[in-house]
Amino acid sequence: NMFTLYFYFSFVTYSLRALSFLILYFASLIIGNLLTLVIHFNQPNYSAVGASGAVTGILFSSLLLFPSIELMIFFIPIPIPGYIFGIGYILYTIYGIGAQNDNIGHSAHFGGAVGGVILTLFYDFDVIYNSKLMLSILCLTTLVAGFLLYGKKNKN
């Protein structure tokens, strides 16, 4: 998480003020934690710790503020367009929430991503005009993922 934060906080602080960055960070953290609480409410043995939601909020804010950004994943030396990474990240996160077979805070990641997108729109409304493709893809993927989560939660 801190490695990701180190590389992407500068994108957000470049576009938003320092205070806005801090609010975005902590609000994404809280939203991620609240979603985790909702999803795992009936699982008394579930525990999580870390800044997953906050860091994911910063990452997705960066994707919106700089739609032409390219990312590289460890061991894959090929630049990936931000919107492709965003789709893959959300889909993997939804899979992880459903599978619950590892010790990763997928629900915090999802909540943080949603918080990062919403707060970025609040702070920089021009993102709607400058990042139409990225915003459309992230919102559509997030909506579909949200419906899948809701359906899975209601089946249990």
Tell what function each PLM region has:
Residues 1-156:
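A detector for small-residue-rich transmembrane helices and their helix-helix packing motifs
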